[in-house]
UniProtKB/Swiss-Prot annotation:
GO terms for cellular component: mitochondrial inner membrane; respiratory chain complex I. Its EC number is 7.1.1.2. GO terms for biological process: ATP synthesis coupled electron transport; electron transport coupled proton transport. It comes from Strongylocentrotus purpuratus. This is NADH-ubiquinone oxidoreductase chain 5.
Amino acid sequence: MVISPSLIISSLNLGILTILLGSIFFFSKSYFSKGNVNFPLIKTTSACLSVNNDKEETIEYNSGPFAMAILKVLAFLSVLSLLVTCNNSIQSINITLSLWLSNTPLNISLNFIYDQYFLVFLSVALIVTWSIMEFSFYYMTEDPNSSAFFRLLTIFLLNMLILTCSNSLFLIFLGWEGGGFLSFLLISWWTTRNDASSSALEAVITNRIGNIGLITFMALSALNFNSSNLTNILSSNENLTPLLPFLLFGLILAAAGKSAQFGLHPWLPALLEGPTPVSALLHSSTMVVAGVFLLVRTSELFSSPLITHSLVLILGGTTALFAASTAIAQHDIKKIIAYSTTSQLGLMVTAIGIGQPALAFFHICTHAFFKAMLFLCSGSVIHSLSDEQDLRKMGGLSKLLPVTSSCLILGSLALMAPLLAGFYSKDLILEATSASVLNLLGIVLSIVATMLTAVYSFRIIFFCFSLSPSCSSPFSHSEENFNLNNALLRLATGTIASGWFFSNLLFAPPSFNVTSLAKGTPLIVPIIGVAALFMSLISSTSNSIGSNAHSATTSQWFFVDAVHLSIITMSLALSFFSSRTLDRGWQENIGPQGIAPTSTALSKISQAGQIGLIKRYILSSMASVLVILALSLLILS
């Protein structure tokens, strides 16, 4: 009996999702039993035994090892599924579990699609999350609610996998909204911190704007095609002409909100108020790439209108340049990495704009490894420096934290050095932009942003390792914890090997007919950026710090100030208008100030008729009778 490869892939992936869903219910902090305790629990160093007043024996343990074991097994299963797909050249597998609503004008079914996009992303997401979960066991060891934290991380991953494997708009929206809700819970994990709560609220409100776009796309698709199946909607491309601008607007708005494009970007740096593992997971392989992944899934809609390509290209290039220029002026190490994420998301959107969705997805996969590693390295450094995050106070980390410092250098070089993960995908995107005949402005913005990427990447290396430490706090943590080292080394392996592996075994990189100068652009641009950094460091003086360019980049192009000022100005203008037109205008004249004059005038009219003349009484009576007769005749006729 020969087993079909499609059946193997479907079974493995459904099993992965089912096990991941079932594992959520086992993240419990304690178990209770009468008498002897014979539960087959995972033994950890944090396990303890206590007896309460009812003589119930309670075992409390940290569920971190259980979460790591589950994700480890699922990661190996996902890699096995990916290898089966590669060996059999399977394009996609569509699975319909059930028709949820079948007797309605809109048929809603639970559809899953297992294609190359999902299978590659599944392996990357599970490996990265496994590493982050292992790091969390080291980082959150003193948190009393660590079991709930592991549960939320797992649910968050599950929502992202539902989003990426769904072929139904209903399930896509479920994963989309689930990721947003879980991000609120994770960012505000330390609920006693006002900054964490306000940052979580900012992220939710900003994502609501993006949700308007996704709901617009879903509503128009449902009304015109009576189907929630994404493949059916995309295959009806010839019937989309009247609706295409509105559908594209919805998709671009949704992606801009979820992937923090320029204009809706301030929520992404706000994620840093949560624990470092949350920042690593959100910035690498889950929530922030959901918008770009949605554009990759629906890239067929972007094939015809060139103006849409230009708009997306300019949006991505502006985002990349804005974030890169802001990152070079930051001093908080986590903020530099956060703005680096925004810049790389802009580069992914640029790839969509030039009609290369496969390159955007390629960059998603390579970016996940080194970005997660950079955040974990920053968390290790911050722990070791007693919560110090200022880049200027660091230095000499190579002797104090050899593993962390090596991984931090590797992650910083991944965006600019050849033969590392980020360079493979970024090289192809820049080469594709050079060969593009679309908007020149977006292409120039992307190239300048890439040069600035080398600046802030090398700036991290320079301040952390070339200088002597100026932090007075003692180094209270070391690298003896194997959970920290294992997580970093696993991600370092992915940073080194993923670019070559994906480009040679999974993706077929397109070839572009470009000049030798354009071919060497990905190598020339980082060198120019590093040279500019050294020149600025050599010639920098205390008087040059107050320059206009430095003020603009430090203040994020004054975007936040402009938005806040516009909101305040608009509120004051509306208040002034309300005060003049309502409180001190017609409402005041009609209401409080108008009742007395109106009553006086009516009283005078009434008094004028009460002067004691009989002829006036008879005249008013006759007039009343005539009016009544006229109304009666009018009604009867």
